[in-house]
A protein has these predicted regions:
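A short amphipathic helical element positioned immediately N-terminal to and/or at the very start
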Residues: 63-72, 346-355
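Transmembrane alpha-helical segments of polytopic membrane transport and secretion proteins
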Residues: 1-35, 280-318, 554-567
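Membrane-water interface segments at the C-terminal ends of transmembrane alpha-helices
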Residues: 28-59, 71-182, 210-231, 262-280, ...
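Glycine-rich helix-loop "coupling/hinge" segments at transmembrane-helix boundaries
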Residues: 230-254, 339-343, 504-531, 565-567
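Glycine/proline-centered hinge or cleavage motifs at structural transition points of membrane proteins
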Residues: 195-197, 209, 469-471, 483
């Protein structure tokens, strides 16, 4: 038997080891928090500050507002055009989004599935697809305008920009509104019916007022996205120019960062103002839908029984869904069709062309998307946990900063990175790291929201119980929090992968010529009029994203079935 001295010595040794391990764990915990907060300040706040500082720099190096006057004189018309397009696009896309969301929320069976599939495909498709399909369907030699209706119309104008932007913004807005509609209290709708209210009265007096804050959110988001969109005006705007398009041309053509920064301030300031309005509206929307947090399979309302308003929404959503089907049908077919004297035939020549010039680009896009998906998801999980559960000092400020990129125009975020990381001690321009960082932090707001929603389902008492049993902070994070966030990990991974494969605005100024991505090959092909190759690139990107989403769905379904079988 061991002597009492030996036992005491082993106990003291074990105690000292535990103390040392606890100190190391606490140090690692604080280091993780420091890295998270420092990264938000460095990669979100600092680029925005660099834009503001550069726009105020005068010729003598001092503070000057002269560049703003120059921008107003030279680009005042473009600014007015941006506001004009933004207002019309916001209104039209919100009306279409509301109609499509109500149709999806009230549909049953295969109709609901069909609507959701169409919107899913539209959501995961790369940018510029709407412009590409618009030219092929409604251009001077378009399939519908010229070949079917024998018309030769000029599609390159402001109304084409408004129409294409509106259609592009509808899927995301409609999915957001569908989620809000599914959380409405079914009891209030039943009570209204029991009191004799008609379907139209329920829609007008109960449903629409409850989702008014969410509808205003869609209006604001559509306006900001329209302001930030440079691709659509460049491709189909013709002589009609917007401020975002002029910023792109100013940076790419003249590399005038002072003027570009001042131009970006006219987009940045309203975006930040709308950001705070957006947060207030989201809080109000959460309060209005708090009565029923469990999502319903369908909204207990029939649009055909809602009178003229219901039929109007059905008609609008039908037009939208038909246009989406035509749009993507055109894009998928164009990559495999060749026109010879007006006669179309099947061909693989564009596939061979894509394989020769774009295979490495496509692989690089997938590689970048996978890196951002994994790193961005882990970062979002950690950030959501420390903000939601640790309640650190300045939590509201850092949460606000982390959400800010959601409302920032992509050109602002991209130019901010050029200004912030173009010199020592942190020179990142020309490297893959600056592109990956920009993608990660541009997508951080949505990823953090997903993780925060999953954390809300984890009772804090489980964490406290683990701490009471002697587990350290990192042990709680590893053994309690991360397992509970597995569904959120998969959702964030899919979102980050999809966004990384289809993003363009914020990284267009950061891409090195030797490290091209597929989405910019798509933009170049559309801009140069090579529509068949552009259609094939868009189709391949869409198929890759849908494959990853389908794989994630199967993994989720398998995990759910395994949990059910265990219970």
């Amino acid at each position: 038997m061991k002597s009492a001295g030996a036992i005491q010595k082993n106990t003291e040794k074990r105690a000292s080891h535990d103390v040392l391990f606890s100190l190391c764990e606490n140090a690692a915990d604080k280091l993780i928090l420091l890295v998270l907060l420092g990264s938000v300040l460095l990669f979100i706040l600092w680029p925005i500050a660099c834009i503001a500082l550069r726009s105020l720099r005068g010729a003598d190096g001092g503070v000057s507002f002269a560049m703003f006057g120059t921008v107003l004189r030279q680009y005042g018309e473009s600014l007015r055009n941006s506001v004009f397009v933004g207002v019309f696009t916001a209104v039209l896309s919100t009306i279409l989004s509301l109609s499509a969301a109500l149709v999806c929320a009230t549909a049953r069976g295969w109709k609901k599935t069909l609507c959701m599939v169409i919107m899913l495909v539209a959501m995961v498709s790369p940018p510029f697809v709407s412009s590409l399909a618009y030219i092929q369907l409604y251009g001077r030699r378009g399939w519908i305008t010229y070949r079917l209706l024998h018309l030769s119309l000029n599609p390159y104008n402001r109304w084409g920009v408004i129409l294409m932007q509106s259609i592009s913004f509808v899927p995301l807005n409609a999915m957001f509104l569908s989620g809000i509609l599914e959380k409405l209290d079914e009891g209030s709708l039943r009570s209204a019916r029991d009191l004799g209210a008609s379907g139209g009265a329920i829609l007008r007096d109960i449903v629409l007022p409850l989702i008014r804050p969410a509808t205003l959110v869609c209006l604001l988001l559509s306006f900001v996205r329209s302001l930030a969109d440079f691709g659509t005006p460049i491709i189909i705007g013709g002589r009609f120019s917007t401020l975002a398009a002029d910023i792109y041309l100013q940076v790419v053509g003249y590399s005038d960062l002072e003027k570009s920064s001042a131009m970006n301030m006219f987009l940045l300031i309203p975006s930040i103002v709308f950001f705070f309005v957006y947060r207030a509206l989201m809080r109000r929307s959460d309060r209005l839908t708090d009565a029923s947090r469990t999502a319903q399979t369908e909204l207990g309302l029939s649009l055909p029984h809602c009178g003229a308003m219901g039929w109007g929404m059905i008609a609008l959503s039908t037009v939208f869904f038909v246009m989406i089907v035509l749009q993507y049908g055109c894009v998928f077919l164009s990559g495999f069709l060749k026109s010879t004297k007006g006669v179309y035939s099947f061909t693989l020549q564009y596939w061979d062309q894509l394989w020769r010039i774009g295979s490495s680009t496509m692989l690089r896009s997938v590689e970048y998307a996978l890196i951002v998906s994994i790193a961005g998801t882990v970062f979002a999980m950690l950030f959501a946990y420390y903000m939601d559960r640790r309640r650190i000092i300045g939590r509201s400020l850092f949460d606000c900063l982390a959400t800010l990129p959601y409302m920032l125009p992509g050109t602002c975020f991209g130019i901010g990175y050029i200004l912030a990381f173009n010199h020592a001690p942190l020179k990142l321009t020309g490297t893959a790291l600056i592109v990956l960082a920009n993608m990660l932090f541009k997508q951080l707001p949505t990823s953090t929201k997903i993780c925060t929603a999953s954390l809300a389902l984890l009772p804090e008492v489980q964490e406290r119980s683990a701490r009471d049993l002697g587990a350290g902070r990192l042990a709680v994070l590893r053994d309690v929090v991360f397992p509970a966030l597995r569904p959120a990990f998969l959702s964030c991974f899919v979102y980050n992968f999809t966004s990384s494969m289809t993003t363009a605005g914020s990284i267009i100024f950061l891409i090195d010529a030797k490290r091209q991505l597929a989405v910019f090959k798509l933009f170049d092909a559309v801009y140069q009029g090579d529509y068949a190759l552009a259609s094939l690139i868009a189709s391949v990107i869409t198929v890759i994203v849908l494959f990853v989403e389908g794989l994630a769905f199967l993994i989720t379904r398998k995990g759910e079935n395994r949990r059910v079988s265990r219970t």
